[in-house]
Every structure is written in C-alpha cells, then in structure tokens.
UniProtKB/Swiss-Prot annotation:
Gene that this sequence comes from: QCR8
Coiled-coil blocks: none
Gene Ontology biological-process entries: mitochondrial electron transport, ubiquinol to cytochrome c
Cellular localization per UniProt: Membrane; Mitochondrion inner membrane
SUPFAM superfamilies registered for this protein in UniProt: Ubiquinone-binding protein QP-C of cytochrome bc1 complex (Ubiquinol-cytochrome c reductase)
Similarity section: Belongs to the UQCRQ/QCR8 family.
Protein name per its UniProtKB record: Cytochrome b-c1 complex subunit 8, mitochondrial
Record-level Gene Ontology MF annotations: ubiquinol-cytochrome-c reductase activity
Cellular component, GO, one term: plasma membrane
Annotated source species: Candida albicans (strain SC5314 / ATCC MYA-2876) (Yeast)
Amino acid sequence: MAGAPHPHTYMGWWGSLGSPKQKYITQYTISPYAAKPLKGAAYNAVFNTFRRTKNQFLYVAIPFVVVWSIWTRARDYNEYLYTKEGREELERVNV
C-alpha cells in the first residue's frame, strides 16, 4: 500500500480499517425537480396553526379563568379589609 487510497475507496468502519472493496451497494436519490419541500407550506401554516390553537384553547382558557377569578376575589377582599366596614374583620384576621 504505497500512498493514500483513492477518495472513493471504502476503508472500513472504525476499528477495522482496510477491509475488502464493497460490492453491490446501490444508492437511490430523488430528483431535486421532483421534490417540492415547501409545497403548500404557507397554506398549511395558516390552517394548521388555527387547528392547533383551537385544540389547545380550553387547556389555556380554563386555568386562566380560574386564576383570574381567584385573583380578583383576593384583590376585592383586600380592598374591603382596608375600608371603614372591613377594619373590624381585619383586626380579627390579624390576630
């Protein structure tokens, strides 16, 4: 073996370099003119985004409504405690 092997020569996998030349290896490709990777991308982006958002809406809306209602009740109760009518209850709560 004098010199470097030809670039198209199979040298073998790691640990067993220098194996015999491989036979009957076939490579299949598709023409770049036949493949249309972005066909319908804009159309599908709009409708797929709408469908996915619609399907996830309740998973976001229900917890939002629950947290919002708890937050507003707590805010209103806090405002009530610091009014003239709520002072007595505030004294009871802050034992």
